[in-house]
Amino acid sequence: MKTFIRIAEIWVPTEDRTELRYHDGLYGTHDEFRALSQQMRFKYNEGLPGKAWATGHPVIFRELEDSNFKRTEAAKAVGLTCGVALPVVADDVLKAVVVLLCGDGNVGAGALELWHNDPSKFFELRLVDGYYGPAVMFELNSRHTGFPRGYGLPGRAWKSNMPLIVNDLNDSRVFLRWKEALDIGVNRGLGIPYLHPSGRTWVMTFLSARNTPIARRFEIWVPTQDRETLIFHAGDCDQNSEFATAYKSAKIEKNDGAIGQAWASGIATARASLAHEKSVVAQSAAAAGLSAMLEQIQVDFTHSLHA
């Protein structure tokens, strides 16, 4: 079973902060696309990474044939259809941009959504843009839906200012569009809030379909009160629903494995292989048959995607 996210990339500013350069990534078998990416640079507001740098919030390209996307032909050759860029910011300074490039094969598509609240103009979250694949009616419904603070997956992530994982979107108390989601096979969701210095809020939602899950596992780790270690907060895995029991007493220190390195550096980390990763997270993932992981850090939490 293929995941909806096919390629993950990490871009970081050059020393003079005039461009973004390639840092690391997960490409599976797409070595030619990796080689092309390693040669590229993105200026401020250029391409998908540069747009996220310029805006300071997530950006969706619902079509990679968009003239703003700089690797159109290469993306088409490996079946990529859409992408999202997630800025990693600390103290108003860009540390990295994580780019997720997706392909659904037009079967059982998942969805990517970007929601926005501007308190000077409206009280709820409104859809900025989204990718829905063949789910036309679900897209239409979403474009005419708003979420007050605390309501639905986007609204609850906004209220808590924490990522929210929902492993059963059939629960109408959590996911207000559950009937439409059921019709297209979407059954899991992840919401990630992004607070902007302007006071505006963006929420990125990943809706996972049974046939093409966004990723095989999501994990959220948060700092302890003394901020000396990270502890497990929430997660979901389609390979082992009981995986969290192994984390009950687990603590991750800075530089301990991929998550600890992301926390220490403030930059996302990628692991194309878990063979030499000794952390409790990597061992749990490997035991579930997962082979790669991406860690992204934000101020008060890290979140992990596994394939």
Regions found by a protein language model. Give the residues of each.
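Sensory modules in modular signal-transduction proteins
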Residues: 1-7, 107-112, 119, 213-218
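Short loop/turn motifs at secondary-structure junctions and domain boundaries
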Residues: 2, 40-43, 66, 74-80, ...
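Short hydrophobic/aromatic beta-strand element in the GNAT-like acyltransferase core
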Residues: 7, 49, 72, 85, ...
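Short hydrophobic alpha-helical segments used for membrane anchoring or interfacial signaling
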Residues: 8-16, 23, 113-121, 126-128, ...
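Regulatory sensory and allosteric helical modules in signal-transduction proteins
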Residues: 13-67, 122-130, 134-172, 228-235, ...
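Regulatory loop-to-helix N-cap segments in sensory/regulatory domains
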Residues: 34, 41, 101-109, 139, ...
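A short, aliphatic-rich beta-strand micro-motif
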Residues: 81-89, 188-195, 291-299
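Flexible loop/coil segments at beta-strand boundaries within sensory signal-transduction domains
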Residues: 89-94, 106, 195-200, 227, ...
